[in-house]
């Protein structure tokens, strides 16, 4: 896709982007994001930030009455190389993500202190585009990430609540605007 000025470069905006992630949290994590990037011929580089719906998780300890409320945000940087057929494009991608999770304990005898963790993840995926117009595309992506850290969510003096998963699978759906 070339910009209207006839150059092989173009700026793109991804908004809104809906995400559903499996595995990092105990239940699917639903999020919304916004991104921007550039295209050069068949190459794309874009960054997207997401915020996810909070989840409450109970401790894995038998008979326990405590847990944590988890909130997550993620920043992702993708590089993709696409192949276009008429109005459709498919592009394999590699990705680098930075995960941010906060946890606040709850339950009997728990002081509700807030703690956070930040760690990187690496991944790969596939994104497909359907160009409804030259300046607007609907895209869908499926990607997998290996988390380079596995934070533990624990309540001091009470025990482990949960350890976050080593990998994540993410499905996204959004609009790409090409000014």
Model-derived features: positions:
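Predominantly the C-terminal beta-signal and adjacent terminal strand-loop region
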Residues: 130-179
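Extended hydrophobic secondary-structure segments that form protein cores and membrane-embedded regions
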Residues: 14-15, 92-96, 141-142
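Outer-membrane beta-barrel domain signature
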Residues: 4, 20-27, 62-68, 109-117, ...
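Transmembrane beta-barrel architecture of outer-membrane proteins
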Residues: 17, 27-31, 72-76, 119-124, ...
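Short glycine/proline- and aromatic-enriched beta-strand/turn motifs that initiate or cap beta-hairpins
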Residues: 2-44, 48-56, 149, 170-179
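Membrane-embedded beta-strands of outer-membrane beta-barrel proteins
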Residues: 34, 77-79, 124-126, 142, ...
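Gram-negative (and chloroplast) outer-membrane scaffold detector with strong preference
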Residues: 41-136
